C-alpha cells in the first residue's frame, strides 16, 4: 500500500459535549471533574463499549466517538442521555452535568489517533444545536434508523450550520419510546 494513501470509510459519528461546562467548572472545579470522571467510568464508557463504539478522542468537556452502525450510535446516545437524567435527577439544575449529542453518518478520513472530514464537522455542528440532555441527528441518520428504532423524531427542518456550505436536515430524537 502506498505511503500517501488515505484511509477512508463510512461511519456513524457521535459528537458530545457538556452544556455549561465552563460555568460548572467555575463554581466547583474538583466536584465537577470528580462527577464527570464517575459518569464516564460508570455510564458513558460502558455504554459506548456495549454499543460497539470506539472513542476517538476526549476533550475536557467532550468526546468524539465512531460507530460502524448508525443504529448502535443512536441507541448509545439515548442510553447515555437517559442514564445521565437518572443519575442527576436529585441535583439542582445548575449543578447537573448534561451532555448535548450530535450524530451524523458520513465518509471519514482516519488515522491512528483521529478522524476527519465533513461527516465529523456536521456531527459537531449538530451537537451544538442540541439542547442540554438532547440529541440531534442529520437527515441521513434519520433516514437510516427511522424504521429500526422505537424512538420518536421531530423534524427541525433545514438548518444553516457554521462553516458548512449547505443547510443540514436536522431531527431531534425523543428519549421516550413510541408504543
Task: Give names to the regions the model predicted.
Residues 1-83:
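Catalytic NTP-binding/metal-coordinating core of nucleotidyl cyclase/transferase enzymes
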